[in-house]
């Protein structure tokens, strides 16, 4: 009901805003402001949960007159939600406080506030404040009668003296919220009041002064009934709205807690000590004990001493307290680090060793190798100069923290320091570092959506090397301090993926999809381009913002965004993230994104190549070789549809169109022609199209639409070949399960060993995924427009082919199609196999294509079969054995990837079509439509 009401209200508001441009702008400004505060509150709540702290608020107001107690107001507030207004909290509590009107002269008031803050958790190893999100303070207002027997005469006198002050405090209470920690402790013996930390405005992120608006929603996708690549189990809940006929999509992302404290929550050391002391006093005395003035003075003195000691530790300002430089090549340097989460800078002092000459020179900058020889120290005041204040003009500087740098790296880690060849303003260095750290933050959000390949932007810093009189850097006297941009040194081939002006230099999809992600993630306010680096570790990006503000001179504003939109070509990663296709008006055109879009260059390292059988007795001259028949195995009454050899190559399984499975003994290695049937049973009432084995089970797929699971016998049972012994009652194989989720004949199967999944395809146009631990179907994919004839698994990717003449590639982790080619063949595709970085497909018209998975283009096409190709056997020697309905077996040489594939041998194997092939490394087995299994030897002519 709330969702329907919200939608109706939203429609009404949109209609009003369409007629009033001024009001529309005001609403947008208000929305951005609310999002900024809500983002901070979400970060705060995450930190609360992380520290197992549950915010609670209890406010009790009691008025007692002449020993008669009257309850004025008791309220127990629930934990604050991110949308709870601080103003509403203040109003509600003020009304409660006002309800206890001015007490009579015989009354006394005591305001006691306890805040559940652990004093030990407020400082870190650097003696700097770590902001924790404390629970809501419990504020109790007690009005005690002057004749209370629990208080002595002195306490009564003190209470009377402080009566007026307490009344004032009653009307001016500070109500704490998750955004601030307020604590006041006033009693008859205390003359000190604790300072109050009030919330300040949320820091801004972007150069234009507005943090990019990001909605943290669940996975969504474009509503489209014609999109084959839409997840079945996803909901069309993606938030979108229309503005000037332009659809804006909010990308599903995951909120992350701030990794470093914000200025919103930073307090001085004296405040921390005071709060800690007050909380400790209130807790130990059960909110009612009264300390005398002498004890308070002693505590105040101790606090001052502790504060002075901490200041001496945190800020070393005298020259004799600086450590000595390790050697003459080292120098002092001040380093600045930017936090994109908090929009603030921290700085520290470090020791660096920088090369005198640059190891690389670009058009605009020089690059020097540098090593950091010390941990970050807070004694930067030793080198304080007026220029440092100019550096931080318009920026937030958090002096209570120091840069984190890369804490897990050794002191021998190489960095790159970059300076400009020409004279530039110091802001250029700070803008570049800020821009790279903002892009790093967006890269982390991109990775949280589980792309095929993750990315990373290098962390960056600004350093100022302090000048000396006897050291020169880059042939320039460094008596004037020199600024550098600093980042980690990258090894590898440096490539530029796209440019600031929209040019795309590579076919890789990951960089382009990241740029598209940033464009949608910020609701079209900005885009990250100029992506370059080693593999998917990037540096030196450029940001274009809609208003053209911030991010240096390279920010081309709306013009730069338009250049990206013109050159961008969506990829399946964009579809995976639910990003609207750029340049396509409706989701029904989304299939155009797939065609011709190169995704596989990103995925080929993740493909897995199985262990193909090795032909041990390969002829010495394969180009002049042939297949010779060794023996014919009879026993089936109908055509042999499938052949399978077990892992240890001791058994041959054959299945036929009458539903029978027969097992043959292959252990006689002395005479390869002696092969005996050892078991037989009827598995199905109709034809068996495919068999599979794992360590425990035999799987049979049939044209009756079922898959049966058979337990493997523990011992070998010898059975005669007579038909009387061929009944299932005498077999040692027992059916332990049947999968009946398909509605038509099951054509092919494969096993995902790593995840223990069974994948099947059927005439019903569906791919089904089964969990072998439960034998339950966990996912169904509406994969093709016609019957699916063949599937092949490699790593986490599944290849499927269909009678609709298409080949599709599926990511089984996401259960979605990541690539598709609609016209791979001119006829139904019957078989798929892989060898190295190549995919082989065969069709009903007798054509074989060799596809390069780096470009997904066919490199060779063979068209020498007269009828449909039924099976392909791949060997590790680099040969394909191909069976066909034209009754032949052809051998194709694929060993040289740089040369076209070619047929080296052709044999008429059966009287009619050949349906299946298998090998144990010594012999080739073929099953035909003539009900025979033939055994072949490959040898020289």
Swiss-Prot record:
The keyword Nuclease does not apply. Gene3D superfamilies: MHCK/EF2 kinase, Phosphorylase Kinase, domain 1, YVTN repeat-like/Quinoprotein amine dehydrogenase. Its EC number is 2.7.11.7. It catalyses: L-threonyl-[myosin heavy-chain] + ATP = O-phospho-L-threonyl-[myosin heavy-chain] + ADP + H(+). One of its GO terms (cellular component) is actomyosin contractile ring. Residues 8-48, 289-317 form a coiled coil. WD repeats lie at residues 635-674, 683-720, 741-780, 783-820, 824-861, 864-902, 909-941. It is an enzyme of class 2 (transferase). Residues 57-234, 276-310 are annotated as: Disordered. Residues 57-70, 84-115, 124-206 have a biased composition (Low complexity). One of its GO terms (molecular function) is ATP binding. It holds the Pfam family WD40. The keyword Protein biosynthesis does not apply. Residues 337-582 form the Alpha-type protein kinase domain. PROSITE patterns: ALPHA_KINASE (PS51158), WD_REPEATS_1 (PS00678), WD_REPEATS_2 (PS50082), WD_REPEATS_REGION (PS50294). Keywords: ATP-binding, Coiled coil, Kinase, Nucleotide-binding, Repeat, Serine/threonine-protein kinase, Transferase, WD repeat. Transmembrane segments: none annotated. InterPro entries: a-kinase_dom (IPR004166), Alpha-type_PK (IPR051852), G-protein_beta_WD-40_rep (IPR020472), Kinase-like_dom_sf (IPR011009), WD40/YVTN_repeat-like_dom_sf (IPR015943), WD40_repeat_CS (IPR019775), WD40_repeat_dom_sf (IPR036322), WD40_rpt (IPR001680). Belongs to the protein kinase superfamily. Alpha-type protein kinase family. ALPK subfamily. Phosphorylates threonine. Not critical for regulating the assembly and disassembly of myosin II filament. This is Myosin heavy chain kinase D. The gene is mhkD.
